[in-house]
């Protein structure tokens, strides 16, 4: 257990390091901590903090910097989040893809780090389908989802269809299967094709296949904004190895998606410092995340990714308010 003096010095050291990014020495702490302690006494306390792994000494400096363990103690026991300090940004109701893209940009612009948003998970359900004859054996399939997204795909058929046949197929699909998932429609068509002419059944199977692929492709799993913000941070601009690792992480997206998936199962804001998530094993990065909802159901997660040297109190506010804005925009979209 740390005594009050050690806690105050650790808090002062971390806040100073977050502010200017420079290793903090005993003389600096003596002036800024508000404690009536000599630099020698502070050096002794800092040595104790280093022994238990809360701070570390870079080889090039006599000062100290926080470790991931130190940041974790700071976030869990010393951080005070002042609510209401942020201006009230807006996120207008819109199509889900637009809301998600705007949210990622909002997170990035407010934090000056990287904004990430996991797209809402939804089944490939269609509300309406139409066929338009383009030329012989060449059709345009128009698929409308329940939330108004429109997907257009061109398909080629084995036989030529008249526009009246295309209308017959579309009417059958819309009257029997509207509101169902594409996979369920595919399975039901297999058992109900007896009542349809062979060429019409074949057309509908092809349409369902291409529709399922189109709707799945339209659901971009994670949207990332602001990667270039890392270039302005000394934490990365002075270390090309770390910068390359970060950009590889954003390009592949798989680990970010897994991390957001973990956050999806938690309530409220979560903070992952350095490699402690074991999903993104990157000691120089921290993630602040929160789930968002649609009509009371958690459907995705969003967050900010930045250096471990981030102002956690402000990031918590940014992520918390953005999750509420996304929830409101998606739940009240007209």
Curated annotation (Swiss-Prot):
UniProt superkingdom: Bacteria
Gene Ontology MF annotations: DNA binding
Keyword list, A-Z: Repressor, Stress response, Transcription, Transcription regulation
One GO BP annotation of this record: negative regulation of DNA-templated transcription
Gene3D superfamilies: 3.30.450.40, Heat-inducible transcription repressor hrca homolog, domain 3, Winged helix-like DNA-binding domain superfamily/Winged helix DNA-binding domain
Function per UniProt: Negative regulator of class I heat shock genes (grpE-dnaK-dnaJ and groELS operons). Prevents heat-shock induction of these operons.
Protein name, entry field: Heat-inducible transcription repressor HrcA
Gene source species: Paracidovorax citrulli (strain AAC00-1)
